[in-house]
Amino acid sequence: MVDTNKLRGVIAENGKTQADVAEMIGVTQKTFYMRMSKGVFGSDEIQVMIDNLHIQNPMDIFFAKKVT
């Protein structure tokens, strides 16, 4: 499960928008927003975001465990 708040923070820190990241990973904005709401991305998409957003600790963002 993706920690979407941390991902949004990294996107903003890099001066990007969610629309920019959608284009970066090759999906429509609608698809990106849907994946953000579900907290699920494919491994290829995750790798592109790690590389392009210079994410230092991807485990904290992309493999976050939600406690309920």
Report residues per predicted region.
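Alpha-helical residues within the helix-turn-helix
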Residues: 12, 23, 51
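Short, basic-rich loop-to-helix N-cap that marks the start of a DNA-contacting helix
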Residues: 38-51
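A short, Lys/Arg-rich alpha-helix, primarily the initiator
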Residues: 1-16, 20
